């Protein structure tokens, strides 16, 4: 990596930096060396994150070297280097600034708005040569892995339940943190949030407290910036800012976050819910106290409940809340009910009436914390503690600064400077049911009032940060313009400022102001014109014409959701949208967060489709799509801004903000360091526009066009608010025709001169070229661990080779891409057990290669019955291996063909909306590997209609190998049938041309060997059937079976599994015998047992269901097939206890039908015959196996006629 020296510091950069990047890093180093604050703007795509990381970490390493130099000099005492001064070891650091020891080297705190942005930053860090000790802080909601805590619905309930478990040492994940947190695997690598959770799950330790441990020794700490700006969060996470370097990335949001973190709205609903909870706890505690008087032994139980509050304490809390409610209701509003505004200091008068003061706040907070922690984790009515938690937050905000000796003066003055109190009628909530106790106030019957305490100065939070002892504060973003006003708002000095140019050239960006549409109508988003038919019609025509000349993805930003929705409604009514979607389909940003990622993925997929002409994404300024998303290259070749997104002018908070700024400016005089209210109002719109413009150019080789569709952009003062890198390219057009001409010319030139963007990973599909099917032999036997893997032997479970031919069919390849993984380009044994399947690898002729649709898509009901294999194949007759061109191989004979046919079947069965949901679910599964989320999306599509059950079962072939068992169980619950029947496993039939291999991997030398001979010659029941592990027997082997008992210690993990047909038969019997209700209870208990491994719980349910009638007892015994190995012995004993001594406990067949003894087997077997008979259905001497397989072709257990292949493929199922 190139090394460059800036301000005396050597920076390791991944590549040769651009001039603007060197300038940016120089400014960062200037801030660090001079211990001053800085505001640095650098457009998106200029690599500011990489520059920040490399420059700060290089400076920190330089400082570490200086500490080493000081230690060497001190140790040498000037004898070794008498002529060398300390400064010569590090010329960028004055001698007085060198820390005394390594622990004094400043930590770096890197903050961004969201964890997803932090994940991108950590990914950038991995691309550098620096390997600092890293810590990322997150909430319990993101990091906690304790099942009980994760179930809590609200974050504050998770916090209190977690604290309670930690205090009582009842969380085993937390108990492991101290012991395991120093392990090299956890302390050394660079871990993000997802890595922490994975490592915590793997090592059984708490990721949340692990991150807090790592924080102590970390060189750089990543966190969302509300952890820094909110004093409550700083205290909760134990963040010490003294002497640290704090970096705010994406700092254009800091102003809003500072104000929101220090503000609150207290509604009547909040107060009512707080009173309800206190009422219920008070009633509960009163009953406990009465019981304790009558029965003293109850007092011990009360003491153990964990709540140290007496009923009198709870009554005081209730009185405080009622007085606060009364004080708020007593405030008189003007006749028009517009609300009343008071100075910020009024909040202390209001709270004092409720006896909430600096002196009492500590006791009140302690009582509320105890109450919430007491209720944490409790079910039913005691889960609604959000109101209590909000009251805690409110008291901490109001009394955020501790006054010396209880003197409220400083805090009152601060509140007067930065806050306003606003009280208005509650329009959003209605009062809950009227409380009818004697404490109710008459005010409860009046309309409720909302108490708002709003901070209007982001400088309030920033000054508090500086007071914590921060060494250097750096704010950076791609859109901070206008810079002067931004620094004024922060109200702290920023000596270092930078407004960087972009790294792109002039021919990569086109910016045009369009004041009029094609019909000559003025374009305006002003309040009085934005909903007029003339304006909406003209805007629709503009969008239609621009979509013709902008290739690929086009983004359209509206000022607000109502404007976007009204525009869409107008265009739909007049057929605009239908005409648009002929060229580019429309995707609309949803209001909710839930569906946003789905819409984005669908947009990306549509743009990336090979034959697609692109797509249009309609979004909102300041919305979810306006920042942090990747619209690079073809995803965003054009951005249309349809208006200036001013805040709502009549909103009380906006009016008060403007009024507050005007007051501050008037008080500071002519040269005051404050914005006017009007300037701030205009700046809010400009910042939102600049953020939207930043979506179009994302890197050095990107290009795109910006369309500003509002006549007000033609004004010079509005254009002056645009980013500095955009302003030189802006051109105002009088004629719309000239816009289309220039844009078309711009894209023609750009497409010729700019390099093609790197292609995204395409889904594998079927090619059209010729070629031959390669057949290669394995260089040697499979490793033991690999040979034990099921997907090595079963082709349908095998992950697909990345070099396979591709096609343009995106739907057909959608399922296949989930299974991709680089593997060796070799054909592997296709059978489940190599000992029984060697000769089955002989390839079929070309006539056998076409799979029926049913087999290709894994859906048995789609087409006709499966055709029979030729008789000569069944008899094991030799066949020739023919190599044919790939053009002769039907698509259905490949994984891609199966996927294509399956997708076609799904598309025919579902509506377009449902099919879109289905494809999106697959993409999410590919990226997240979350089977539960996939099932939640697929269940409503397929499970409700019995005709679609086969499609859900057919999806089994595309589920990743480690999820197949879980998906099998889900299918069983949803459809009543399993989905792993032999044809869906993709067994050896019709697998293409392969050569038969012997156990050493060489080509089979005896061409005349028949199927039966090959099987019987190599079969040894102890060594080769599942590597000698027990199958149906769950207990110890009989003493006489010495050959097999040698392997009893190496039981396969899935050896206790039953065949799906056995499970289906049992569940069908349960449904028939116990009815729907009993069946549902048993399934629920079984699912819970799988998750928590609680044997007592599941047995209690099953025993209650199956022991009411004597005839139901066999169901209890057969339930043993689901019992895990370490519970088998207890289950057998329980069956004996419940059934009586005369009833035999379920044996290895888990209560299934008894296997008939084999009259053929006369081989001597030491030990009692009774014990041997329990496993006689599976263990046979070689002679008996040979006779059964070669002559009778019957199952050795049930004597049913069958082919040898079926035996190999279904793991010897029990007879039905």
Curated annotation (Swiss-Prot):
Region annotation Disordered: where it falls in the sequence: 978-1018, 1140-1172
What is the reported tissue distribution? Highly expressed in adult testis, liver and ovary.
GO biological process, any: telomeric loop disassembly
Instruction: Give residue ranges for domain Helicase ATP-binding.
Output: 7-295
Its EC number is 5.6.2.-
Motif PIP-box location, chain numbering: 1172-1179
PROSITE patterns for this protein: HELICASE_ATP_BIND_2 (PS51193)
Q: State any single GO MF term.
A: 4 iron, 4 sulfur cluster binding
Q: Which UniProt keywords apply?
A: 4Fe-4S, ATP-binding, DNA damage, DNA repair, DNA-binding, Helicase, Hydrolase, Iron, Iron-sulfur, Isomerase, Metal-binding, Nucleotide-binding, Nucleus
According to the UniProt record, one GO cellular component term is: nucleus
> Where does the motif DEAH box lie?
249-252
Q: Name one Pfam family in it.
A: HHD_RTEL1
Stretches assigned to coiled coil: none
Where it sits in the cell: the answer is: Nucleus
Positions annotated to bind ATP? 42-49
Enzyme class, UniProt record, top EC level: isomerase
Tell me which residues bind [4Fe-4S] cluster: 144, 162, 171, 206
- Which SUPFAM superfamilies does the record match to this protein? P-loop containing nucleoside triphosphate hydrolases (SSF52540)
Q: What is recorded about the domains? A: The PIP-box (PCNA interacting peptide) motif mediates the interaction with PCNA and localization to replication foci.
Q: Which PANTHER family match?
A: DNA REPAIR DEAD HELICASE RAD3/XP-D SUBFAMILY MEMBER, REGULATOR OF TELOMERE ELONGATION HELICASE 1
Q: Which family does it belong to?
A: Belongs to the helicase family. RAD3/XPD subfamily.
Quaternary data: Interacts with TERF1. Interacts (via PIP-box) with PCNA; the interaction is direct and essential for suppressing telomere fragility. Interacts with MMS19; the interaction mediates the association of RTEL1 with the cytosolic iron-sulfur protein assembly (CIA) complex.
NCBIfam families for the chain: rad3
> Which protein is depicted?
Regulator of telomere elongation helicase 1
Species assigned in the record: Bos taurus
Gene that produces this protein: RTEL1
